[in-house]
From Swiss-Prot:
Record protein name field: 21.9 kDa heat shock protein
Transmembrane segments: none
Molecular function per GO: unfolded protein binding
Induction: By heat shock.
Gene Ontology biological process terms from the UniProt entry: protein complex oligomerization; protein folding; response to heat; response to hydrogen peroxide; response to salt stress
Length: 206
């Protein structure tokens, strides 16, 4: 009897656990900027970043942001004259950031590396007498890609790094206008045309 009662209790616990899992909201709903947002972006922002922030992916998820954008969050705005992309890269030196443009595909690529605390001292041989009590700042490599829309002059891209913010400006082609939608003529007889043909046939028979 005791074994039967124990099995019943375990079955009830399993059922309750399953209900809790089913009632839990989707994880993506807790993330303000995730893969669903990227797929809905009309400018097709392409995201990839093999970065490893302090604490790993779990720490980034707990902080409410995907690991893919933890090191280099960005904004993209369009003005009448240009597209302006700003990327937060605090602690990243100018020599550790690279901006590339593929003119054929109109893809702008920003990549870089934020070095871990103490890396510079180790390279310069300044380890003697230095003790690190804490190193929490995220470190790792990152890269972000953006496909520029037609009309962006990817041959005149300019970039500037100030106070940990990288600003990339892509001017627009002067006088560029997007293609107007082409109206397609529809072939085939409409209801009115068919009625006219019937009337003509009737008169001919008379």
């Amino acid at each position: 009897m005791a074994a039967v009662a124990e099995r019943e209790v375990l079955g009830m616990v399993a059922a309750v656990a399953a209900m809790v899992v089913m009632m839990a909201p989707p994880a993506a709903a807790l993330v303000p900027y995730g893969y669903g947002y990227m797929l809905d972006d009309p400018f097709r922002v392409l995201e990839q970043s093999p970065l490893r922030p302090a604490g790993g992916v779990a720490a980034a998820a707990a902080a409410g942001e995907p690991a893919a954008v933890a090191l280099a969050r960005c904004d993209w705005k369009e003005t009448p004259e240009a597209h302006v992309v700003t990327v937060d890269v605090p602690g990243v030196r100018r020599g550790d950031v690279r901006v590339e443009v593929d003119e054929a595909s109109r893809v702008l690529r920003v990549s870089g590396e934020r070095r871990r605390a103490g890396a510079a001292e180790e390279e310069e041989g300044e380890r003697d007498g230095v003790r690190w009590h804490r190193a929490e700042r995220a470190a790792g490599r990152f890269w972000r890609r953006f496909r520029m829309p037609p009309g962006a002059d990817v041959g005149r891209v300019a970039a500037r790094l100030d106070d940990g913010v990288l600003t990339v400006t892509v001017p627009k082609v002067p006088g560029h206008r997007g293609r107007e939608p082409r109206v397609v003529a529809i072939d085939g007889a409409g209801a009115g045309d068919m009625e006219a043909e019937v009337v003509k046939a009737s008169k001919a028979e008379m």
